[in-house]
Design a protein with these regions (language model features):
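Short S/T/G/P-rich N-terminal loop/turn motif that feeds into the first structured element of a domain
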Residues: 1-141, 146-171
């Protein structure tokens, strides 16, 4: 969900939770107890290069891959530069569509976190895309050069594969 600001998000959720139509939905037995726990929110700001590298999805369906990178202290700028100048374009060559890139701003690692979403034709193709990407000589060179002053990542990236719901604008 996109909001004008953090405060606007707060206002929007208050309005939503107090909406009579929503309350009526929650009162229906088939919607009781659906969630095992309360949803969590992560507030993010879009990176300055996100809109420039974004691709359209050619065919509906497929899978989305949400990746979270945590860098070593003071290395987020180097990681963003690598994505901006090299990685996003190399993704395109290997069947990965760039959807968006964000920086979290209210987590313990916010100053060192990049979160992005890419699209693949299917889960099996995602593995093939990554294999081709990591073998790409241009990627290998960009990685080597960006890490000339030391490794960038503090730990391996986290990744989650997702499917768009039938009501999602990403379908």
């Amino acid at each position: 969900l996109k909001h004008r600001s953090r405060y606007a998000a707060y206002e929007n959720w208050i309005k939503f939770n107090n909406d009579r139509e929503w309350a009526a939905v929650l009162d229906q037995p088939q919607f009781q107890g659906l969630l095992a726990e309360k949803p969590t929110s992560l507030f993010m700001n879009e990176t300055e290069y996100s809109t420039r590298v974004r691709n359209a999805i050619d065919k509906p369906g497929g899978v989305f891959e949400l990746r979270t990178y945590v860098t070593k202290p003071d290395k987020l700028t180097a990681l963003n530069q690598r994505f901006k100048k090299h990685t996003a374009q190399i993704f395109n060559r290997h069947g990965m569509n760039n959807i968006g890139y964000w920086a979290a701003f209210d987590t313990p690692d916010s100053a060192n976190t990049l979160i992005y979403l890419i699209h693949h034709a299917n889960r099996k193709q995602a593995d093939a895309n990554w294999k081709a990407f990591t073998a790409d000589p241009e990627w290998q060179k960009a990685r080597r050069e960006s890490e000339s002053n030391g490794k960038i990542l503090a730990r391996p990236p986290k990744r989650i594969f997702l499917r768009a719901m039938n009501f999602s604008p990403l379908r």
